[in-house]
Each structure stands twice: as structure tokens, then as C-alpha cells.
């Protein structure tokens, strides 16, 4: 699949393990993994940060293979899911940082152009999440209130 605002094709990606069964050397059960997700979610970590932490320190290759559910679904069941989807949150955070930069550097034309691209990605992603009912239908991105969303 091609990139949205770049000429690259985006063919590089991580390969999923061939076998979808739980490795024999993994001593954690599904309940142990869910408990770890609960603890890390309480600390305020995002689903991808939780996945990295479980992979690096506990040896859980794919949470879905062990528990049968993805991390975000487990967090939703426990009531720990973030109110904004993670990718949208980080795009808004990037746009807020770019606006702050543009306040200090008014003549930075390239950053102004890149901000337009980032905000168009935000609008496109928000439209997708509204159709999937992840966001409420009246949710709207506004640059004036964006810093409050990511604070």
C-alpha cells in the first residue's frame, strides 16, 4: 500500500510468526498476560507500549496468540481503553507541536505545509473512525482545542 503524502510504496513490514500457536517455552498463561495488561494499562501505557513491554520483558510474542484477543479489546473489557484511538492521538499531538513551532518561527513555510498534510491525515482518520463508530458522529478536530485533547 502506498504512502499518503510521500512517493514511497511502503513495502517494508514486520513478518508475523509462521506458527500461530503459543511457544512451548512461554510459561505465562492467558490470565497472567491479562493481569500484566491491566497493570500496565493502569499506569497509563498505550496498547502498543504494552505490547512492546510484554514482548521485551516477558517474552510474549503476540498477545493475540496467547489470549485469543488483541490488547485493545482486553483493555476495553477492563474499562481501560483510551477515549481517542492511539494513531489519531499521536497525529493530534504532532499537529499541536507543529503549531507551537510555527508560533515561534512564523516564516517556516515547509512546516506550515507539513502541518496542512498532518491535519488532512487527522480529518481523514477521524472520518474513518466515525464510520466505524469509534468516535461519536459529532466529534470534530479543531486546532484551537487540540492542545486540550493531548494534554
Swiss-Prot record:
Pfam families: Ribosomal_S13_N (PF08069), Ribosomal_S15 (PF00312). Keywords: Ribonucleoprotein, Ribosomal protein. The keyword Metal-binding does not apply. Gene3D superfamilies: 4.10.860.130, S15/NS1, RNA-binding. The keyword Transcription does not apply. Coiled coil: none annotated. GO terms for cellular component: cytosolic small ribosomal subunit; nucleolus. One of its GO terms (molecular function) is small ribosomal subunit rRNA binding. It comes from the Eukaryota. InterPro entries: Ribosomal_uS15, Ribosomal_uS15_arc_euk, Ribosomal_uS15_N, uS15_NS1_RNA-bd_sf. CDD domains: Ribosomal_S15p_S13e (cd00353). GO terms for biological process: translation. Belongs to the universal ribosomal protein uS15 family. This is Small ribosomal subunit protein uS15. It comes from Choristoneura parallela.
Amino acid at each position: 500500500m502506498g504512502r499518503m503524502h510521500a512517493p514511497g510504496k511502503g513495502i517494508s513490514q514486520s513478518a508475523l510468526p509462521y506458527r500461530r500457536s503459543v511457544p512451548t517455552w512461554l510459561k505465562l498463561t492467558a490470565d497472567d498476560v491479562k493481569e500484566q495488561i491491566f497493570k500496565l494499562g493502569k499506569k497509563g501505557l498505550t496498547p502498543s507500549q504494552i505490547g512492546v513491554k510484554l514482548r521485551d520483558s516477558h517474552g510474549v510474542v503476540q498477545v493475540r496468540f496467547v489470549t485469543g484477543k488483541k490488547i485493545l479489546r482486553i483493555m476495553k473489557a477492563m474499562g481501560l481503553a483510551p477515549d481517542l484511538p492511539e494513531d489519531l492521538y499521536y497525529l493530534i499531538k504532532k499537529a499541536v507541536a507543529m503549531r507551537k513551532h510555527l508560533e515561534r518561527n512564523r516564516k517556516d513555510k515547509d512546516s506550515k505545509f507539513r502541518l496542512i498534510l498532518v491535519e488532512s491525515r487527522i480529518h481523514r482518520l477521524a472520518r474513518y473512525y466515525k464510520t466505524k463508530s469509534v468516535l461519536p458522529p459529532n466529534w470534530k478536530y479543531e486546532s484551537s482545542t487540540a492542545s486540550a485533547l493531548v494534554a
